[in-house]
Swiss-Prot record:
InterPro entries: RraA (IPR010203), RraA/RraA-like (IPR005493), RraA/RraA-like_sf (IPR036704)
Organism whose genome encodes this protein: Alcanivorax borkumensis (strain ATCC 700651 / DSM 11573 / NCIMB 13689 / SK2)
Residues where substrate binds: 76-79, 98
Annotated protein name in UniProt: Putative 4-hydroxy-4-methyl-2-oxoglutarate aldolase
Lineage: Bacteria, Pseudomonadati, Pseudomonadota, Gammaproteobacteria, Oceanospirillales
Cofactor: a divalent metal cation
GO molecular-function terms, A-Z: 4-hydroxy-4-methyl-2-oxoglutarate aldolase activity; metal ion binding; oxaloacetate decarboxylase activity; ribonuclease inhibitor activity
Enzyme class at the top of the EC tree: lyase
The family this protein is said to belong to: Belongs to the class II aldolase/RraA-like family.
């Protein structure tokens, strides 16, 4: 999948939403990725992130509302490796990751607010496939998200 979010915005100005007001950092081996939105809402518990990334993710991006917490990581190298094996295009986390040197070597996009070496606590909590909001955008399961070094955008239909 080849695209530039700037061009997607220019060509679809009436239908895209741009995530704003957050300083995202890219840690994965892919600079650009996109696909159908799948959502998880959790706070400092990556049980649902691990669960979802263990399923078939071909053509999909997991978007996680982690409440913006940077106190512990919601994804690290082992979960990301499993996501690659299951065909996920990428992961966008309103929260933190860890194992950043290993993430950079994986063929997957990983965008988060930052990194921290502390792992998540697993309490088997979190919600799947619900509307979540951060960065001024509502992420709806079944819609589409595209991310590159220019930013993150959403659209109600596939643009690529």
């Amino acid at each position: 999948m080849t695209f530039v979010t700037c061009d997607l915005c220019d060509d679809n100005a009436d239908s895209v939403c741009v995530v704003t007001g957050l300083n995202w950092l890219s840690y994965g081996g892919r600079d650009a990725f996109g696909g159908e939105i799948v959502t998880v809402k959790c706070f400092e518990d990556n049980s649902r992130v691990k669960e979802h990334l263990g399923t078939d993710g071909k053509g999909k991006v997991l978007v996680v509302d982690g409440g913006g917490s940077l106190r512990n990581a919601l994804i690290g190298d082992m979960i990301a490796e499993n996501a690659v094996k299951n065909g996920w295009e990428g992961v966008i986390i309103y929260g933190a990751c860890r194992d950043v040197d290993a993430l950079a070597k994986l063929d997957i996009g990983v965008i988060t607010l930052g990194c921290v070496p502390i792992k998540s606590v697993r309490r088997d909590e979190g919600q799947l496939n619900i509307e979540i909001t951060f960065g001024g955008v509502v992420f709806r399961p079944g819609e589409f998200v595209y991310a590159d070094n220019n930013g993150i955008i959403t659209a109600p239909k596939a643009l690529v």
